[in-house]
Amino acid sequence: MSSEPVTYYMIVNKSWLKIINYESPKSKRSLSGYLIKLQSNHCIEKRGYFFTDKVHLLDFIDEGDTIVSIKLPQNFDELVVVRDGKGWRSNQIIIENTSKLHDINTAKKFHIVGINDQQVANLAIKYIDVSILYYLISTGVELKSNIGYIHWWNKICMDFNNPERYFVRKLLDLTPFYVVSHGPSRNKNSQTPIRAPFETQVHNPISGQECYVQNFYFTDADRAMKFLSNGLSVFVYKIKPYLSNNDGINDIIREVRPNIFWATCVVNNGIYDLAKEDSYDSLLDLEFNIEDLTIFALKKNWAKIVYLLVSRHNFDTIFKTKLLFTAAALGYENMIYLLMKHQPIYSASQIIMGSELSSSFIMHHELDIYKVADLPVPERFIDTFLVLATVGGSIRTLTAFIKKYTEHFHKHKQIMIMYAKYYSKPDLLALFEYYSNNIVDNHITQ
């Protein structure tokens, strides 16, 4: 017995239905549907009719204004179906029925909480439909932070007659952002009644307490860790701008630096301690970048957390090499050992591909070392690693390397000496001189 045919979906312009002469069934007795087929069976060449499943349908809202429910013909020898990205293409489909894309029932029918929340929000944005936003708010979901929403708000917040104004306000109610720096705070009921410039009122809905915080700056999840890496904070605050004043003066969210914002009032919806392992699972659920989180933990020299992230996630060779090089340049010798325990990264003589693994890139972009030496730039894995370990002053690592791989040391010692002189590493200069004069070559297999 054949299984029940699966229902799939298309999004098309309503005019397409007229082109194929489709008319909706007038009664529920019309169960056979409406068969349409290409003139040719070769749907790969002719592209065919594209359809997808319920999970991915709302990825395609820009394709039209009408949802078409379809099934595939059964027992047709000439039927061809091929996979195409998040859907399929076929040379034959059976149209069952149609419905409007812009409908609150569409959002409810195709919303899978935690899976396609953003796609439902995109449907609301396409039609500026606040009822769909209210539906999302009722389900308790949060969208991924998006600074584009803040730019949108700032363009229209003073235009009180703009119908988009209320819509974007509700959109920001669904959208968290993350604090990247802040100054001192004081209790709201302190002796100083007047707020200082760039002092933000922070409300904690759990405790009900409020305080004023200076220079309370925030951004989205994609940028938060990169800004936090350059500061001292080990906490991520999740906040939402609080926009409630009708006069519009306090509704402006200022861009204090590119992609960094300040608001007069925010709601604090959570705090994550980056020194604790369980915070990382929460931040990954909030769509923080796993590589940014790992680099942050590495720069803090939190070996246990780095080991946890590296062992759980299948990082590519380039990123694992970047971790090792960054640890070497920072002089974190325990971290170097931990990373070297994982699968081989590059062979010693392999040329490093990609500028993001160059010694100058690591020093400039990952460590903020602006005094980059005007010296020969290493090109291979081994001399890049040795140069960065020299910059980091990793005496124990370099001593162990020299003893085990004497031939490589003699081959690369001149560039190591140049970098040790430039970055003022007298202990390493003494180490290199000692082993240059006293060590016996130990040949290694290339």
From Swiss-Prot:
Superkingdom of source: Viruses
Official protein name in the record: Uncharacterized protein R735
